[in-house]
Regions:
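Non-catalytic, usually N-terminal nucleic-acid engagement modules in DNA/RNA processing proteins
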Residues: 1-58
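Short loop/turn segments at strand-loop or loop-helix junctions that form parts
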Residues: 1-8, 58-65, 70-72, 181
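Short secondary-structure boundary/capping segments
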Residues: 9-13, 73-77, 142-144
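Extended two-metal-dependent nuclease catalytic cores across DNA- and RNA-processing enzymes
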Residues: 18-21, 52-54, 78-241
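Conserved phosphate/metal-binding and DNA-contacting active-site motifs used
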Residues: 44, 51, 57, 66, ...
Length: 242
């Protein structure tokens, strides 16, 4: 997210006369912006945690070529097809990978990488992002876009996940359960229990099957247990209800 924002912010449209336009960007400017943003965010985290000791910083990236969720739901993120990344995105990402400790696993998104690392370093980590989906990962989450902190328990993370399955995500192009928004999702979970059956019942009421509910759950679920991904075989264990 930070690389995308930094690369996007330095783009400049140039008119060469008449109808000829091109888009230009200076990767060095984007890299400077990236470092400034990272420095500011790290300072906020350390101040909030009242911590002055050593720490590690890991940048997570999505696999740019494959995404296991598209094997589960072919239309996943289909609304982004044809949308170009910022002109210097690739150069800035490579620059970050050359200078920072970075993680990117085949077929996974950056969110999954964070979730797996969160499990590995449980109790000694802070998840930093501007993505609301991180509320489905147990642990300490700093939303730098809104300057908000969350301490999310396993129970709360599971509730947030079940709600997300029903709500869906227009940005990622999975629809969830028709007619259910955030308020309704919270109400049905409070009324009928924070269990998979509650989700299935809502899908069935909408004329959908448990299989369709499971499909939505598998794309909504952010990997957050190390056993969910085999780093040697690059194999994902898809989410299943308990």
């Amino acid at each position: 997210m930070l690389v995308f924002e930094s690369a996007s912010s330095v783009e400049t449209p140039v008119n060469w006369g008449g109808d000829l336009w091109t888009l230009h960007a200076n990767a060095s400017d984007a890299e400077a912006q990236f470092e400034d943003r990272v420095s500011l965010i790290v300072d906020k985290v350390l101040n909030h945690m009242d911590y002055e000791g050593e720490y590690g910083l890991i940048m997570c990236f999505s696999d740019p070529k494959q995404n296991f969720r598209k094997e589960v739901l072919s239309t996943y993120k289909g609304n982004r097809a044809g949308k170009l990344k910022p002109v210097c995105y690739g150069a800035v990402r490579q620059w970050v990978e050359d200078r920072y400790d970075c993680v990117s696993y085949p077929t996974l998104e950056a969110d999954d990488c964070v979730g797996l690392l969160a499990d590995r370093y449980r109790g000694h980590e802070v998840h930093i992002s501007g993505d609301k989906d991180f509320k489905t990962i147990p642990g300490v989450f700093f939303d730098f876009l809104h300057d908000e902190w969350f301490e999310i328990s396993e129970k709360q993370a599971y509730k947030n996940f079940l709600a997300q399955v029903m709500i869906g995500d227009a940005a990622d192009n999975y629809k969830g359960c028709p007619g259910i928004g955030p308020k309704t999702a919270d109400k049905v979970l409070e009324k009928y229990g924070v269990v998979w059956k509650t989700v299935v019942d809502q899908f069935k009421k909408a004329g959908l099957s448990e299989g369709e509910a499971l499909q939505q759950a598998r794309v909504a679920h952010i990997l957050n247990k190390e056993e969910e991904y085999d780093v040697c075989k690059y194999k994902v264990t898809l989410w299943n209800p308990n």
